[in-house]
């Protein structure tokens, strides 16, 4: 509200990228230290309610496979919270954490990364992780993640389906390529549709959550119509019911 009204942010607990840090605020660069698996036996020892929390099973438990996001989307804080450098968590540690949860009855996993596949150069890393999940014998699981759907190839799409991806979120934001460019999102909307077709061809038939942000920079009736038309394209690929 203060920005919209043209007021200063001097008294707020935030900073503006590019400006010199103000006295009294803590500015810390993200560490690149490898993240080891959570020790759920220890967590259970200090939190007796853990097993009660995990009962039921109709939910996802978060597991992080990487930190950071290399992109420059104008509205997103992930580059401030986690940094722009992508730090991959060791595959064996990710699988070890999933195994602990699996043995406690968990079958739903949410990969809490800012982006599960942040750029095309991380496609092979995603494949390595999914192959390791298969090799570990974590059968009957379902997993979900926030993905940039422009970073797929047919083999990765097949692995995602085979290992139990049951839900994914994509931040389309707008069906107007003009507005996507102005928000510095760095992807081509046609490429996203091609990747979605790869997932459908691989057998994905589950839920797709599409994030839109109306009234963004230079939004107008024409661009809203483009967004509605784009959503219809996604429905044509996955079906109307799974896409929301």
Language-model region placement:
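Residues that line or immediately flank small-molecule/substrate-binding pockets and catalytic motifs
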Residues: 7, 80, 113, 172, ...
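Catalytic cores of alpha/beta
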Residues: 156, 218-233
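Flexible glycine/acidic-rich beta-alpha junction loops that bind and position SAM and/or redox cofactors
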Residues: 9-11, 71, 119-121, 178-183, ...
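Acidic, low-complexity intrinsically disordered segments
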Residues: 1-97
